[in-house]
Regions:
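Boundary/entry segment of secreted carbohydrate-active catalytic domains
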Residues: 1-23
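General structural concept
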Residues: 22-33, 43
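Conserved residues at the C-terminal ends of beta-strands
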Residues: 24-27, 85, 166, 276
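Soluble non-cytosolic domains of exported or imported proteins
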Residues: 6, 60, 93-100, 199, ...
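Short acidic/polar active-site loop segments enriched in Thr and Asp
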Residues: 22, 80, 222
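Substrate-binding cleft of extracellular glycoside hydrolase catalytic domains
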Residues: 34-144, 228
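Substrate-binding and catalytic surfaces of secreted/luminal carbohydrate-active proteins
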Residues: 13, 104-108, 117-123, 129-130, ...
Length: 330
């Protein structure tokens, strides 16, 4: 439970609509949250928690979960994606082997309900599954994850599911790997040219995404859609964590996504990106930065001003800590 002072779900729904946020990611299937977003225009990505993956090895359990936790709210609540686990593959322990079987059971349950074409499913990974690659055209997956990545990629391809990844340029900055302008989308000229492709890049977000594009292409999955399920910037807790840098990163990210085109190597691929997070999380474990990725305080005032434009029918995505646990106390 990462936050004990959040507003009520219906207040959150009003805030999200008022902010012109069209796509929302939550981390479980909290019924109060699903109910709050019924009869809104917001598209919801709901999650299966890591703690539930063992139970999701049972088809009857998953069938029951879909029947009781999703179908009563659908389609009044516009659920478009189910994420199965969060960065599970990175842990390289026995639990990583639970992800694909759990997803198979989710697919089977969706097929039974005839919803497999309406609700997409995948599992968000962190960028740790990629080998450090420079230039991007030499992007490959880390061999450490081969045993779990091979069945996962085959499964995603077979079901036309997106590859979901959490990308945080902030950590490259925090580790001293990059210049601030390059990380904050402030470089007007190209920072490097990929000698293999001749393509130039002026921000690390595109470079990281193209490492993934090439890693997929090298495995013959170049047509697989990518969704960035988390990115963001903290406002406290490290020298580079500040309100100014967070506002600059997220504002420039939104502009970059809205302006198109895609990345240097995949210019025709529409960028789908979720900003983490809607609220600060006062109980989250770990460094102070982890508690300070929010765009809003729990009282729903802004940590900093961020405009979510509605341009040409394209609108914005947010990952919300609102439902990190289904046992949130309201």
């Amino acid at each position: 439970n990462a936050n004990n002072n959040l507003p009520q779900p219906d207040q959150v729904a009003q805030l999200v609509e008022k902010q012109n946020i069209q796509y929302l990611r939550i981390y479980d299937s909290n019924p109060k949250v699903l109910m709050a977003f019924s009869n809104t225009t917001i598209e919801l990505m709901v999650g299966v928690r890591n703690a539930d993956l063992s139970a999701f090895q049972s088809q009857s359990y998953v069938d029951s979960w879909l029947r009781n936790s999703i179908l009563p709210y659908y389609p009044a609540t516009n659920i478009t994606h189910i994420t199965v686990g969060v960065e599970m593959v990175d842990s390289l322990d026995d639990a990583t082997n639970l992800v694909v079987p759990a997803m198979r059971n989710v697919v089977s349950a969706l097929k039974t309900a005839n919803l497999q074409d309406r609700i997409k499913f995948s599992t968000p990974l962190s960028s740790a599954v990629l080998s450090p690659s420079y230039p991007p055209s030499e992007g490959v997956f880390s061999s450490s994850y081969e045993n779990v990545l091979r069945p996962l990629l085959d499964f995603l391809e077979e079901n036309q599911s997106p590859f979901m990844v959490d990308l945080y340029p902030f950590y490259a900055m925090n580790n001293g790997d990059s210049s601030l302008d390059y990380v904050l989308f402030k470089s007007s000229s190209s920072i490097f040219v990929d000698g293999n492709t001749g393509l130039s890049c002026n921000n690390i977000f595109d470079a990281q995404l193209d490492v993934l594009h090439f890693a997929l292409a090298h495995r013959n999955f170049s047509r697989m859609k990518i969704i960035v399920t988390e990115t963001g910037w903290p406002t406290r807790g490290s020298p580079y964590a500040s309100i100014d840098n967070a506002q600059t990163y997220n504002t420039n990210l939104i502009r970059h996504v809205m302006d198109g085109p895609g990345t240097p190597a995949w210019p025709h691929e529409e960028l789908v990106v979720y900003i983490f997070s809607l609220f600060n999380e006062n109980l989250k474990q770990g460094p102070e930065t982890e508690r300070n990725f929010g765009i809003f305080y729990p009282d729903m005032t802004s940590v900093y001003n961020l405009v979510f434009p509605d341009k040409g029918g394209r609108s914005w995505c947010i990952a919300s800590s609102q439902a990190l646990d289904s046992d949130l106390q309201y």
